[in-house]
Amino acid sequence: METIILFAPLAGALMAGLTWRVISDAGAQWAATGFAFFAAILSWVVWISFSGDMQQIYVLDWVRSGTLDAALAIRLDAISAEMMVIVTTTSALAHLYAMGFMERDKAFDEGRSFRPRFFAYLSLFTFAMLILVTADNLLQLVLGLQVSGVMAYLLIAFRLHYKNANAAAIKTFVVSGIGHAGMILGVAGLYALTDSVALDDIFAALPDLDRTPLLFGLSGLELSSGLILLGALAISAQILFHVWLPDAMEAPAPAAALLSAVFVAGGAFIIWRLAPIYAEVRTVSNLMLGMGAATALIAGLVASAQTDIKRAMGFVASAQMGMIFAALGLDLGLGLYNIASVQIPLFVVVQAMLVLCVGAITRAFDDNRDMRGFGGLRQKLPTIALTMTLAALVATGFGVAQSSLAVFAPETGNLLFEFAFAAHPVTFWVLTAAAGLGVFAIWRVVFLSFNGPSRAPQDVFNAVERSPTVMVVTLAALSVLMLGSVVWEINTLSALTGLAAPAWISMSPFVATVLGFVLALWFYILQPALPKTLASSMKGLHELLRQGFYVDRVYELALTAPLKRLGGFLSDVGDGRVLDGAVAALSARLAPSYSDIVDRRFGGVLLCGAALVLFGLVAVITWTVLTGGQG
């Protein structure tokens, strides 16, 4: 059954992408969506019936070279069973939502069939994430990461006619590629240390590993785990690597939801999966804690100044994931991995729901994303307003920010803050401020969109249409899944006990949450003119936050522009003059008649020559297979 779950999205992608001319455009959409729901249903069956004993389910042989032996296999344990449910269910609902959302997408010419390709991309992304979350060895983990990165690029660049889509896709590919490079180097380091890429072998070898410093006073294990952390931070859009996610929201809403929820959670999942390793490397865990706390604070600040609703949601996702990385980076012996085990799935569901609600808003406004022109949408989109308000309540009160959960489960809701204060008091204050900012940023989006009078021209507001039924049904189903996740979280965390911390520490997240909500209410409902007045009086600070502390600009000046100039120079001088000139000169001197022969044989058509090369390659491969390469 687990193997069927893994390959069902791949089957849906192949059917949608390759047979849509036969089964029709609508048939391709239903095929991809049907296979996604089939995988989701089976995932629920596996999770409910899971006995608690880890199983390794062989799929096929993959890599065998010397001591390197890595099969494609499914590691079925509590972590993977839970993540299979979350990935497949969220993806299936995103597929269903897309059937309504892409119905009249204006990025393409009328009559041009593009939807099957989009649904194939969604299904392939789901397949890649399932490879990642079920990995039994590090090579399979890297494979899932690489394929999901490629699919992220294709999904973001899907709307070819959108001005910033291609640039956003390239940025995502480059930033995630840096993370992938770090991941590969880290995996290579662990293989060098343990002579294996199997998770069980690596975990078993940890107590006996040599801790002698190799570089910068760090051991081989610390260096390897640090490189893997680099990859996880890049994928999860943490500070310094966060620049790709706001731009990636250029993707259509169903894709943006999966990228900002499922893909971003992939980095945290890797750390969660490799928990025994990070329990051994305190230095790297401290780095994880610092990066997570800094991201939560800075991304929360930046999100609070955005006017583009989709970019605001991108920064919110980075901030929320920063809180999760902070939990992962705290002392692993304190039980915070149990917090992460419910935070990550809940984050996926809530973030997906928020972005899909935002997609419904922008679709109603003909893809206008400026929140300053919204308002009053509760009248036009009552169901969307209800579901997004519910998602905001959960996001700001039930554990994603680890804030108001203290109201419902006082003994567990403030665990993160109690442990943070005990370990690093400065981090405690950073996380408390970040929790309040996260609450403010989310409710700011809700209030600007749905409450108060409409700020759009009357004709534009009158033209707003309600979302298709299929989109509303999707959001209703996500609401049920989200509330179920909340119940699951509270039940799971109720088994944990906090520290004997002062009462003011236990109350601090609740106070931060209330303060963030009250400020958002005051600024955007009670005194709607106040934000504009403050922005005018503090233009420098407001512009600094709106521009994201100019991180993109710094990268442009320090990295992108010099590399572009270097690439242009190498292309003009190295490729254009040196290589092309040398080849032309050698061809003219050493083989004067070769071009005539090629011209006579192939008529100068490059495709004919390429076909000959392909034919020769097929012949060589066939000969190797038949003879075993033995002469």
Label every model-predicted segment.
Residues 1-7, 23, 27-30, 69-86, ...:
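Membrane-entry segments of alpha-helical transmembrane domains in multi-pass membrane proteins
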Residues 25-37, 168-180, 379-388, 465-477, ...:
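Alpha-helical transmembrane segments and their helix-start/interface "positive-inside/aromatic belt" motifs
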Residues 34-49, 179-189, 388-396, 474-488, ...:
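Hydrophobic alpha-helical membrane-insertion segments
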Residues 93-141, 151-464, 482-487:
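Hydrophobic transmembrane alpha-helices and their helix-loop junctions in integral membrane proteins
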Residues 493-504, 526-631:
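Aromatic-capped, Gly/Pro-kinked transmembrane alpha-helices
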Residues 1, 15-120, 193-216, 222, ...:
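Transmembrane helix-loop-helix hairpins at membrane boundaries of multipass inner-membrane proteins
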Residues 456, 464-517:
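Hard-cation-handling environments
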